[in-house]
């Protein structure tokens, strides 16, 4: 069994701003988001301890829609 699995991908709107992948780490029991630019280069990972996968997916969708801003990037 894999220790992590990708749950979903959210593409930024407007296009050209990259995408976010929602992952779950079964060993750590942790949901997280990996953020990528349009060149498929990962530029940030955000952990969500003690949050549901639905919460993590909502955060990724909010980023893709421009509602959620990443701090310290």
Name what the model sees in each region.
Residues 2, 38-73:
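Mixed-charge, Lys/Arg-enriched low-complexity segments
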Residues 24-44:
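Short aromatic-glycine-(Arg/Gly/Cys) micro-motifs in beta-strand/loop hairpins
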Residues 1-31:
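Short N-terminal "domain-start" leader segments
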Residues 10-12, 21, 36, 44, ...:
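Short, flexible coil/linker segments at or flanking structured domains
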């Amino acid at each position: 069994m894999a220790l992590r699995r990708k749950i979903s991908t959210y593409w930024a709107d407007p296009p050209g701003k990259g995408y976010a992948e929602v992952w779950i780490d079964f060993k750590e029991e942790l949901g997280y988001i990996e953020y990528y630019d349009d060149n498929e280069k990962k530029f940030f990972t955000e952990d969500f301890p003690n949050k549901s996968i639905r919460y993590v997916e909502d955060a990724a969708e909010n980023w893709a829609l421009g509602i959620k801003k990443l701090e310290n990037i």
